[in-house]
């Protein structure tokens, strides 16, 4: 008799995805982030569900309902902080995952890569709308500033913004629809993640060497299930340290002030994980130009497979490209720092230089380094 996990129609899918999946024998801890992202998504859906049971999406009561969750609901404070800091952990894992894909040339799996970019946009949209829900000062002004960027679109911009707002300003209609979208998007993300995995399992995983590993595969379970548990424990430890000791470290103090349309905060800024894109937006004095740069800062990922000029897949044996990759990482950290600073000298200049470096590294320097490395191979 055949084992049930190999014969049952439903369990068979799980078996082929997580148990008997042929996996390269040499993948490192950088391949752990995919499973960690899955854990983050499940955690966010569960904590979000419990928060939604007590939250009210009305401008009059939203702020006090979040306060009520923290003060009166049984363990409401820990659920709220796990959800807020869970989003930060989600983005840390997400950026590491994308960075690993860029370093080891995983973008050559074009379908998997493109669905990954769609996932990134969906997660960013979800996080942005979630930040609006507590209806604090930064929630309100963040929503106003970011949605208002759409007015830069010629002809239809103003109508589009008013359509998204559901009125002539960010108000009750905006909050209600943002809550509805924030609730539904994680389920769309789950479906996209399933398609992401489907395409990945069509080709099999990449590995650090960048060479095909068909001749050297091992089953996912028990080898990588146990390896992933280590990463999972590290993730949970970091998250719980944040939640229990520094719950507000990554948040903005202004969001503890109820939203007031008549009082603008001194520095409007998004959550830390959007600061690099916000810095790129601010570095261009023109509104439409800034919006285009903002979108391109993420959409440029879709161009990476086209810009790949090297004969080697990953950067494992390409020191010049490695230097540029870590320059890009340092540049993104600089942009993140600049995004949180006020718009004044010298931060404006640093932001503009970092933005130019970001685009020139990806569009010009990396393709050139690939060509140079190809030439060096012939010597």
Curated annotation (Swiss-Prot):
Cell compartments where the protein resides: Mitochondrion inner membrane
Superkingdom of origin organism: Eukaryota
Binding residues annotated for a ubiquinone, in chain numbering: 201
Segments passing through the bilayer: 33-53, 77-98, 113-133, 178-198, 226-246, 288-308, 320-340, 347-367
GO molecular function: metal ion binding; ubiquinol-cytochrome-c reductase activity
GO CC, one annotated term: respiratory chain complex III
Cofactor(s) listed: heme b
Membrane is among the record's keywords: yes
Binding sites annotated in the UniProt record for heme b b566: 97, 196
Cofactor, how bound (note): Binds 2 heme b groups non-covalently.
Residue sites binding heme b b562 per the record: 83, 182
GO BP terms in the entry: mitochondrial electron transport, ubiquinol to cytochrome c
Keyword Iron: yes
One family name in Pfam for this protein: Cytochrome_B
Topology in membrane: Multi-pass membrane protein
InterPro entries, sorted: Cyt_b/b6_C, Cyt_b/b6_C_sf, Cyt_b/b6_N, Cytb/b6-like_sf, Cytochrome_b, Cytochrome_b_C_euk/bac, Cytochrome_b_N_euk/bac, Di-haem_cyt_TM
Keywords, in A-Z order: Electron transport, Heme, Iron, Membrane, Metal-binding, Mitochondrion, Mitochondrion inner membrane, Respiratory chain, Transmembrane, Transmembrane helix, Transport, Ubiquinone
CDD domains, sorted: cytochrome_b_C, Cytochrome_b_N
Further information: Heme 1 (or BL or b562) is low-potential and absorbs at about 562 nm, and heme 2 (or BH or b566) is high-potential and absorbs at about 566 nm.
Family: Belongs to the cytochrome b family.
Subunit structure: The cytochrome bc1 complex contains 11 subunits: 3 respiratory subunits (MT-CYB, CYC1 and UQCRFS1), 2 core proteins (UQCRC1 and UQCRC2) and 6 low-molecular weight proteins (UQCRH/QCR6, UQCRB/QCR7, UQCRQ/QCR8, UQCR10/QCR9, UQCR11/QCR10 and a cleavage product of UQCRFS1). This cytochrome bc1 complex then forms a dimer.
Function summary: Component of the ubiquinol-cytochrome c reductase complex (complex III or cytochrome b-c1 complex) that is part of the mitochondrial respiratory chain. The b-c1 complex mediates electron transfer from ubiquinol to cytochrome c. Contributes to the generation of a proton gradient across the mitochondrial membrane that is then used for ATP synthesis.
Entry protein name: Cytochrome b
Source organism of this protein record: Puma concolor (Mountain lion)
Phylogenetic classification of the source organism: Eukaryota, Metazoa, Chordata, Craniata, Vertebrata
Gene: MT-CYB
């Amino acid at each position: 008799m055949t084992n049930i996990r190999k014969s049952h129609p439903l369990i068979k899918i799980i078996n082929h995805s997580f148990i008997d999946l042929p996996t390269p024998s040499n993948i490192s801890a950088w391949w752990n982030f995919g499973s960690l992202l899955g854990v983050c998504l499940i955690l966010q859906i569960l904590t979000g569900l419990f928060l939604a049971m007590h939250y009210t999406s009305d401008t009059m009561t939203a702020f006090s309902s979040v306060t009520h969750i923290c003060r009166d609901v049984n363990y409401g404070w820990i659920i709220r902080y796990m959800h807020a800091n869970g989003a930060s952990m989600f983005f840390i894992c997400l950026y590491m995952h994308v960075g690993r894909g860029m370093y080891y040339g995983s973008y050559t799996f074009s379908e998997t890569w493109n669905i990954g970019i769609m996932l990134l946009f969906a997660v960013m949209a979800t996080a942005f709308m979630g930040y609006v829900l507590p209806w604090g000062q930064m929630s309100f002004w963040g929503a106003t500033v970011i949605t208002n960027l759409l007015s830069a679109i010629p002809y239809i911009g103003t109508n589009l913004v008013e359509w998204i707002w559901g009125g002539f300003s960010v108000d009750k209609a905006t909050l209600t629809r943002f809550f509805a979208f924030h609730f539904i998007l994680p389920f769309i993300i789950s479906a996209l993640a399933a398609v992401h995995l489907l395409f990945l399992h069509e080709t099999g995983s990449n590995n650090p060497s960048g060479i095909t590993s068909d001749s050297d595969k091992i089953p996912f379970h028990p080898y990588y299930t146990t390896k992933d548990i280590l990463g999972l424990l590290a993730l949970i430890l970091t998250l719980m340290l944040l939640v229990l000791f520094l719950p507000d470290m990554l948040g903005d103090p202004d969001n503890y002030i109820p939203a007031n349309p008549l009082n603008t905060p001194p520095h409007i800024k998004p959550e830390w994980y959007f600061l690099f894109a916000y810095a790129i937006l601010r570095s261009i004095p023109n509104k439409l130009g800034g919006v285009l740069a903002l979108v391109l800062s993420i959409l440029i990922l879709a161009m990476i497979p086209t810009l790949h000029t090297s004969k080697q897949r990953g950067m494992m044996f390409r020191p010049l490209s490695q230097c540029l990759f870590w320059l890009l990482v340092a540049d993104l950290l600089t942009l993140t720092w600049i995004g949180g600073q006020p718009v004044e000298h010298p931060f404006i200049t640093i932001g503009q230089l970092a933005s130019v470096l970001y685009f020139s590294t990806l569009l010009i320097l990396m393709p050139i380094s690939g060509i140079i490395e190809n030439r060096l191979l012939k010597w």
